[in-house]
């Protein structure tokens, strides 16, 4: 193979660019120079200089374009008869050369030796053939081969996506057949994955196949995410076609007679086109989400699926299996799946009986420092907004959040306090969790029974030492939250961070006047951090300036009285007195 390529290169080196232009001109002017066609094809190669490739490409494109409607559908030789028509044989030969030309263009397109400008020209040529080859109908076969070469190439797909997005994805038939091709690629990958599971191979081969699978999955996701979503019929009544005919996305009739009877008269209404686009969009995405996604792609999909996919699906509940499986994984993945699952439950009637149990399990300290904590906390507040929430469930979430407030940063304690405040306002049945101070009741008991001082002391110790809430229990029904109290919130009154203690004090006064207070907006607290708390503190106007008066000038930063029982001496270096 290498010797053949070297011979071609040596043969091509004999021609100059001017001579190459002359060969193309002769081919276009007279049929007698048809032998220039195979010669020009030899220059369409990644090894050829870019200017030679472009010149040959332009000549061959100009030659084939007027003949596309006359070429047979395949390059197979005509049926052997006694009198073969030379014209039929000639057109079959032209078709074989055209197929060779397309194959060479695809090789140049995905070659790592090709320049980006050359790739743009080649891609434009192939898209012109897609437009013209099938007599005004979209030629899906060439387009599928084009996408297949892009998906399975080692070249960065962003180079091709920039061109496709800017020039071609605005046409509805291009998007339509892109979804069809993506679905076919996914089915091929699914078959290869199932085959790999049944065949036991060595570790190197297994790792190579896994890497190639992940690369293909990433490229398919990049293509799907770059395609504009299906447009609603009300937004745009006329759809722009690359092929210029609505028949491109019509169903193919099985009967040849019916096909000829329909002819070019079949025009689809915008509503029908929108329906079929939505159907192909749904099939492509649902089939893609069945693949084993790499973790980075998994997170990207979950972060955007509620905005880019769910609103455009023909039946959003088809995502039920994917989202419930993601929600059951736990950790960050569950947090990211919560938004989409909540949309399916509230807007599309999805029933998920273990939703609140899984949500309860997500309440761990790491959630309050996660990347998507702001969205999660807002969704948490929305999920607990119903006044029909059972008392045990509201109490369990309230108690779980209050316990978390002791072990998270101050910004998290602020948002937790706001969440608890909203829960108490929405669910009057759990107001008993906010108890009076225990010592006051005990003092009243001791005054009434001074003759028996030992018994009240025992009761006091027992009341202060028991909390029936089990923080390790994953089932809210068994947590025992209804028998507990929010002593953690009382602890926050002595928090080291002044904004937290001030916030708790303000809530104590507000809770006594429920009719004149409103729920707190959780989004106002979600973006808090050490930096925002510090910034708010230094911007506060201080009414009293704290001053320190010393009768004598201090000789050290800390006085000895600050460290009773300790003696600090400065060790002297050797050789000094």
Swiss-Prot record:
InterPro entries, per database record: CCAAT-binding_factor, Noc4
Region Disordered, residue ranges: 230-263
Residue intervals passing through the bilayer: 329-349, 350-370, 404-424
Chief location: nucleus
Coiled-coil residues: none
Database matches in Pfam families: CBF
Topology class, membrane: Multi-pass membrane protein
Keyword Nucleus found: yes
Tissue specificity note: Mostly expressed in flowers and stems and at lower levels in roots, hypocotyls, siliques, leaves and seeds.
A biological process term (GO) from this entry: embryo development ending in seed dormancy
Assembly: Component of the ribosomal small subunit (SSU) processome composed of at least 40 protein subunits and snoRNA U3.
Stated name of the protein: Protein NUCLEOLAR COMPLEX ASSOCIATED 4
